[in-house]
């Protein structure tokens, strides 16, 4: 596990972009795994400005809310199109289908996509409770793509994106922890003091399902990029 501490979110995002650019330019990155939320927004803005050619790169995403159409401004389809896909050309882009009514079939469909497009670099954020994707504390390390019940803390963290608290979805489709760990390389991004405790448990704590991100200690190629605040408890 390589640890990089930077001055701020912009510097950390640029460091992550360097790794991604190098992988794409060398031809080592054919599939790029992407995350959503506030953490990677600056990375995507920098990627849009970058000269790196992504037309032969396929993308996959970690998760999507259950019940939201791709056209819904709160869906992750919309988020990705707004911040990245409408501004940068990729070969193909895959996300779980939030409108799928057969959860088992949708999860199997997405796992098939992941098997056809093995992830070369997976970008991750981390929740204040240590979740990666929507894999909440207690999720099995053997989990593959699944339908998850969102915890109160996760819904609370995401309610700022919705007009009303009751509009925040209660479920999501998420790549499982095993699905994430199958990526050849992982870049974990964390910025801000509110992520410091989760980062401490991820890097220094025991590998335990109560902090899902702690499983990254078992991955052979992880780069953790932090700002000074997120690194403050290390």
Swiss-Prot record:
Coiled-coil intervals, chain numbering: none
GO cellular component annotations of the record: cytoplasm
E.C. numbers: 3.5.99.6
Disulfide bridges in this chain: none
Enzymatic reactions: alpha-D-glucosamine 6-phosphate + H2O = beta-D-fructose 6-phosphate + NH4(+)
Pfam name, any one: Glucosamine_iso
Pathway: Amino-sugar metabolism; N-acetylneuraminate degradation; D-fructose 6-phosphate from N-acetylneuraminate: step 5/5
Keyword flag Hydrolase: yes
GO process annotations (BP): carbohydrate metabolic process; glucosamine catabolic process; N-acetylglucosamine catabolic process; N-acetylneuraminate catabolic process
Gene3D superfamilies, alphabetized: 3.40.50.1360
SUPFAM superfamilies reported in the protein's UniProt record: NagB/RpiA/CoA transferase-like
GO MF term (any one): glucosamine-6-phosphate deaminase activity
Keyword Zinc (UniProt): no
Residues of the active site: 63 (proton acceptor), 129 (for ring-opening step), 131 (proton acceptor), 136 (for ring-opening step)
Alphabetized UniProt keyword annotations: Carbohydrate metabolism, Hydrolase
HAMAP family: GlcN6P_deamin
Annotated function: Catalyzes the reversible isomerization-deamination of glucosamine 6-phosphate (GlcN6P) to form fructose 6-phosphate (Fru6P) and ammonium ion.
Protein family according to the UniProt entry: Belongs to the glucosamine/galactosamine-6-phosphate isomerase family. NagB subfamily.
Record's protein name: Glucosamine-6-phosphate deaminase
Source organism of the structure: Listeria monocytogenes serovar 1/2a (strain ATCC BAA-679 / EGD-e)
Gene symbol of the encoding locus: nagB
